[in-house]
From Swiss-Prot:
The gene is rpsF. GO terms for molecular function: rRNA binding; structural constituent of ribosome. It holds the Pfam family Ribosomal_S6. This is Small ribosomal subunit protein bS6. GO terms for cellular component: ribonucleoprotein complex; ribosome. Belongs to the bacterial ribosomal protein bS6 family. Binds together with bS18 to 16S ribosomal RNA. One of its GO terms (biological process) is translation. Residues 97-187, 199-241 are annotated as: Disordered. Keywords: Ribonucleoprotein, Ribosomal protein, RNA-binding, rRNA-binding. It comes from Mesomycoplasma hyopneumoniae (strain 7448) (Mycoplasma hyopneumoniae). Residues 130-151, 161-180, 199-210 have a biased composition (Low complexity). HAMAP family: Ribosomal_bS6 (MF_00360). NCBIfam families: S6 (TIGR00166). Residues 109-118 have a biased composition (Basic and acidic residues).
Length: 241
């Protein structure tokens, strides 16, 4: 079973029980025997506007599927900011300090002033070149991942803004339709009232005209005698010749 070393960075306000419970849940109760808190608290760059955090280091033996489960749970735990998993069977651990090698000071004779200096650099071995190329490839890969992540976030934000704009336009369109419907209903009601009022006025005028006609119409009395007719004719103004 491979041996792993897990470094976790927690929120400075979080408790140690969070990482302790996570390790026990994934790897078992005996997984926290070598769990220890490091003295380092400073961050190389701010995380969530904080420059300090808690560092925890643990060594354990676990299969690959449990490591994947730990990664999944760590990603959904808000208090865990960062984590790093090192396979000690293939890589050097984080708590292993390099040995200080003593350099033998060799006596180099003083160069004569007439000798030409040797400006040729030290030739690099094939393994050093491969290590440098691997480091460069890893840096390029990390840079590409960061660029893709930033591009994905930017596209997501742009899509969210577009969705909000479309929703706002739909709401405005529905509001305009409601306003237009209300305006048309009000106009139709007003027109109907005007038509009704005009009809009523026309009826009043017609009835008034009929009453005036009946008032000034001469009375035709069949029993109108001759004497009254003469009196009526005498009252008429005489036309001048």
């Amino acid at each position: 079973m491979p041996k792993y070393e897990i470094m976790t960075i927690l929120d400075p306000k979080a408790e140690m029980a969070i990482i302790d419970n996570l390790l026990k849940t994934v790897f078992g109760d005996n997984s926290t025997e070598k769990l220890r808190k490091l003295e380092t608290t400073n961050l190389a760059y701010p995380i969530r506007k904080s420059k300090i955090a808690q560092y925890f280091l643990v060594e354990l033996n676990a299969p690959t599927n449990l490591i994947e489960e730990f990664v999944r749970r760590a990603n959904i735990t808000r208090e865990i900011w960062r984590y790093l998993i090192v396979n000690l069977d293939s890589e050097k651990g984080l708590n292993k300090k390099p040995k200080i090698r003593e350099r033998n000071r060799k006596y180099t004779p003083r160069r004569d002033r007439f000798d030409k200096p040797n400006f040729r650099g030290n030739p690099k071995s094939r393994f050093d070149q491969q290590d440098q190329q691997a480091t460069k490839n890893q840096q390029n890969f990390q840079q590409n991942q960061q660029n893709q992540t930033s591009q994905y976030r930017e596209n997501s934000r742009q899509n969210q803004d577009d969705f909000q704009q479309v929703s706002s336009n739909q709401q405005n369109f529905r509001q305009n339709q409601q306003n237009q419907s209300g305006y048309h209903r009000e106009n139709n009601r007003q027109n109907q009232e005007n038509i009704h009022q005009n009809n009523k006025n026309h009826q009043n005028q017609t009835s008034q005209t009929q009453r005036s006609r009946r008032q000034y119409q001469p009375i035709k009395n069949p029993k109108f005698n001759q004497k009254e007719k003469e009196n009526y004719n005498n009252k008429k103004p005489q036309s001048s010749n």
